[in-house]
């Protein structure tokens, strides 16, 4: 059984989810390649520096590069896409706010792989999240910027502050119902 809690377990789930997404794109005639699927490993040293940088817009965009790229040669349609693999039996998906901001700038498709289906939505088209969660640890400068940006984009979102987070990133994130996403086939 895949470890659902540790960093390595989450990354293993993402690898499996990416393979499913790749097969689905390829089934529709797309060419697919990973872009920044393993960025946590390849950018580990840079990420540490970016978290303390005052104004890192260019590096921020590189650090939050989407997981993959898909291109349909006949239709001349391409997508940058980010794969999310929520825990089994979940009806929600969470996205770090700094990732959401960058994925919106990249005009990326967020692809969510559940136990039974593959869903997707453009980052820029997501509705107001169910909530924004701000962990009890102080945000980095870029996480604070992403939090302020998200509050402007979604002024009606409920913000829960000082929340203890046991596992995963301590960066602020937003939570959406899976109902906010359409079938991936809609985009293909």
Question: For the regions a protein language model found, what residue spans apply to each?
Answer:
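Non-catalytic C-terminal interaction segments of nucleic acid-processing enzymes
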Residues: 1-5, 9, 16, 27, ...
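Active-site metal-binding core of divalent-cation-utilizing nuclease and nuclease-like domains
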Residues: 1-5, 10-11, 34-75
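Conserved alpha-helical elements of sugar-nucleotide-dependent glycosyltransferases
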Residues: 13-21, 99
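Alpha-helical scaffold elements within enzyme catalytic domains, especially in hydrolases
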Residues: 23-24, 102
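Conserved catalytic cores of phosphodiester-cleaving nucleases, focusing on short active-site segments
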Residues: 25, 66-89
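A structural signal for short, well-ordered beta-strand segments and their strand-loop junctions
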Residues: 33-36, 80-82, 110-114
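Short catalytic/ligand-binding loop motif for oxyanion handling, primarily in non-cytosolic enzymes
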Residues: 42-43, 89-90, 118-122
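Mg2+/Mn2+-dependent nuclease catalytic core
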Residues: 86-107
């Amino acid at each position: 059984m895949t470890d659902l809690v540790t960093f390595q377990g989450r990354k293993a789930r993402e690898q499996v989810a990416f393979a499913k997404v790749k097969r689905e794109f390829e089934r529709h005639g797309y060419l697919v390649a990973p872009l920044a699927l393993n960025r946590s490993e390849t950018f580990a040293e840079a990420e540490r520096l970016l978290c303390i940088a005052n104004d890192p817009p260019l590096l921020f965009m590189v650090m939050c590069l989407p997981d993959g790229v898909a291109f349909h040669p006949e239709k001349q349609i391409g997508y940058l896409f980010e794969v999310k693999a929520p825990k089994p039996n979940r009806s929600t998906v969470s996205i770090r706010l700094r990732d959401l901001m960058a994925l919106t700038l990249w005009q990326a498709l967020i692809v969510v792989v559940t136990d039974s289906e593959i869903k997707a939505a453009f980052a820029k088209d997501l509705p107001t999240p169910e909530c924004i969660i701000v962990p009890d640890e102080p945000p980095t400068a870029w996480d604070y910027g992403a939090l302020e940006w998200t509050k402007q984009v979604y002024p009606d979102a409920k913000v829960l502050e000082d929340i203890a987070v046991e596992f995963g990133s301590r960066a602020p994130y937003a939570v959406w119902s899976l109902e906010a996403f359409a079938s991936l086939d809609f985009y293909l």
